[in-house]
Amino acid sequence: MQKKSIELKSNNFTLLVLYLNNQNIDLINQSLYKKIQECPKFFKNAPIIVNVSKLCNTVDWKKIKKIIISHGFFVVGVSGCQDGILKKNIIDSGLPILSERKNNKSNIITNFFINSYKNKKKETINKVEKTHIIDIPVRSGQKIYAKHADLIVINNVSAGAELVADGNIHVYGIVRGRVLAGANGDTSRKIFCTGLFAELVSISGEYWLSDQIPSEFIGKSAQIYLKNKFLTINSLS
């Protein structure tokens, strides 16, 4: 039997979702710039969905779209749009309106929010003061951030959950969510886990999605770190 030339199938992809919680275009531009500076390699050329549920129809959508694209993102669609006029403006700009499912948290890498732009003192990259220990399961939709600290999880991490630490991350259990170590830019940090099924792993902005993790390490004990600016993975056994 001859194989079909093309096939259309449903699938799940892990994408960034950008929530616009403010109508001020200059503020959005400043906040995007600031966010990208935190992890420029992580966000570079990233495909994203833009959530506009907080925007009204008077906003200059074409300008917002232009600003987002100017920061290096690829907008694949728009979600959360309930206003007819805004919806028409979005469609006229060449972007599709996407419907959201109730369990869409499992398909989000990280939600980053545009609320307000606040100047903060630059933090020392290698400043790790303490260790956070979590001994209960980390559920889908939960996000744990260990600021200036290592993070140790002595339990399982569900799909759709997110672990973030400025230091190292240790997971003594099965990890199916997202794991981001060295979040403040420290390239010496590592990820250790005993059951690797992660949706995403990242060290200082360098990341692998689940399908980029070498298959021989899936479900195994592993350590992940940066070597010559590239992600490297080794067995712990």
UniProtKB/Swiss-Prot annotation:
Cited SUPFAM superfamilies: Cell-division inhibitor MinC, C-terminal domain
Stored Pfam families: MinC_C, MinC_N
InterPro entries tied to this protein: CAP/MinC_C, MinC, MinC_C_sf, MinC_N, Septum_form_inhib_MinC_C
The entry's keywords: Cell cycle, Cell division, Septation
BP GO annotations: cell morphogenesis; division septum assembly; regulation of cell division; regulation of cell septum assembly
Quaternary structure and partners: Interacts with MinD and FtsZ.
Family, similarity comment: Belongs to the MinC family.
Protein role: Cell division inhibitor that blocks the formation of polar Z ring septums. Rapidly oscillates between the poles of the cell to destabilize FtsZ filaments that have formed before they mature into polar Z rings. Prevents FtsZ polymerization.
Name of the molecule in the record: Probable septum site-determining protein MinC
Organism: Buchnera aphidicola subsp. Acyrthosiphon pisum (strain APS) (Acyrthosiphon pisum symbiotic bacterium)
